[in-house]
């Protein structure tokens, strides 16, 4: 019978093979779009700033068509480069579009002066200037910037110009993070990240764009695979560039942490809390199929190479193989573990229609049971004595008991806590009154009491690590739809 299992494993491997691995697929058979991309032949600070404003205006213009917006956006992201033509050539390495490079020698009264090699007539140059002047109505001051007169302020030198360029590019990169996932709810996270870069000095407040401009840029990114291919190539270069050597690629590398593995959260959370915890529940026969599936998915992720973290941004069809419905039971167990071990998952909407509430409850129980358990490998490496192990287990048990009665200011209402706003406030108030704890605002006193309890437990080192049982598990999310308790022992 072993041959049957071998054949089954090979079948799973064949089903999870990345698309296009055999070669001979369609390459360039669809119609190619001509995307005009602008480059500047001058290093003059004022000309470079005029070029950036020109590209930004076209990228958000209401009169510009899609290819023109896409080309202007690529030009905007290349505007920091010493030789822009070489940088633009990176974007041309694709089968989705053909880039037509239009060289600009300078600007005269806001009108670009094209090089003769570009073959752009004076009439067409005037048309580009008219398109650049058609901004969204929400830009009330007639510029893409919230601060009026920001674009008319001439830069002092090339350093000032680069700071302005990076301020705009940072806002463009921030929009990439949720361009392909939850773009309709991206305003809050974009504002938070822009504020972060302002505090770091990477974005100047004077050159903050209108939200409608960022939304238009984000829509262009969603609609254009050519732009997204260029963005991924820049993200790869940012990861391969040594830290501290390039201001621009330091920024790209920082933004990369928000973009990598977007859309794969369920897969990596399942690996972290379902596989990496190495609980005895993995021996259940009912989880063997999901574990085998995860094994094949990990192999598929490695086969994707450098493009694996950017499957969502590229619109890769292989991303659907990583959906949690493919390993629903193991996913349910992992989310039960995460709901107890990691309160940071509170903002992740893990409750799905296909979730098994039985396996979710099993994960909760295992996570609570592991709260005071000891990692034997780490204990052996630290050379802990039996008395120290018992003391550590007792301290962990004591902490779990103390924290259950303390009003934690970070507790949030949500599916993980099972509390409504009124219920959580009543619970916190009742706990303070019954236990005689300080008021909610006195968090320092509560923290000191907690640390004293831990220190006392470590000094006592009791002979037995057993304590009172922990409080009950958190409520099961969603209605109870399965009463099957056969775990396949």
Swiss-Prot record:
Its main location: virion. Keywords: Capsid protein, Helical capsid protein, Host cytoplasm, Ribonucleoprotein, RNA-binding, Viral nucleoprotein, Virion. InterPro entries: Paramyx_ncap. Residues 422-437 have a biased composition (Polar residues). It holds the Pfam family Paramyxo_ncap. The keyword RNA-binding applies. One of its GO terms (cellular component) is ribonucleoprotein complex. Residues 1-375 are annotated as: P protein-binding. It comes from the Viruses. The keyword Cytoplasm does not apply. RNA binds at residues 178, 193, 258, 348, 352. Residues 1-402 are annotated as: Ncore. Residues 421-489 are annotated as: Disordered. It is found in: Virion; Host cytoplasm. Residues 403-489 are annotated as: Ntail. GO terms for molecular function: RNA binding; structural molecule activity. Ncore is globular and carries the regions required for self-assembly and RNA-binding. Ntail is an intrinsically disordered monomeric domain in the C-terminus. Forms the helical nucleocapsid (NC) in a ratio of 1 N per 6 ribonucleotides, protecting the genome from nucleases. The encapsidated genomic RNA serves as template for transcription and replication; encapsidation by N is coupled to RNA synthesis. Forms the encapsidation complex with the phosphoprotein protein P. Before encapsidation, the newly synthesized free N protein, so-called N0, is chaperoned by P. Homomultimer; forms the nucleocapsid. Binds to the viral genomic RNA. N0 interacts with the phosphoprotein (via N-terminus); this interaction allows P to chaperon N0 to avoid N polymerization before encapsidation. Interacts as N-RNA template with the phosphoprotein (via C-terminus); this interaction positions the polymerase on the template. Belongs to the paramyxoviruses nucleocapsid family. This is Nucleoprotein. The lineage of its organism: Viruses, Riboviria, Orthornavirae, Negarnaviricota, Haploviricotina.
